Amino acid sequence: MTFHFTVRDDKQIRVIIDTDADCEADDPFAIAQALLTPKFMVKAICAEHFNEAGSMERSFRTASTVVQLLNSDVPVLEGARTPLAGLHLASDEDLSPASRAILDEALSADTHPLFVLCLGAITNVAAAITATKN
């Protein structure tokens, strides 16, 4: 998509979208809007679970479909399959790809502000924060 304006580099922000995209219809619209917003440098889309078995996988597929339809190359990553209480996080190796990406982006040398847009459960974010304590 071509825009008739640009956003200066120092005004852009890094964004990670953490979403239970298959739970309700608003998340795919939010993903599309974020991907089309020139101010946002969307670094990753992280699939979240919701209150059904296999929900993270369904969210992953829905988010992947939105990314494909918009011809975007933003990575869609699998997140936690259960709430934090059900996760075993003895070490960083136990993190899901989504939590690892959140942690890595937060610790990167990039000086652009980082925002994590949580559109559902926050298990992936909580796991990343918990990993910093280990």
List PLM regions with ranges.
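N-terminal acidic, glycine/proline-rich low-complexity segments
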Residues: 1-134
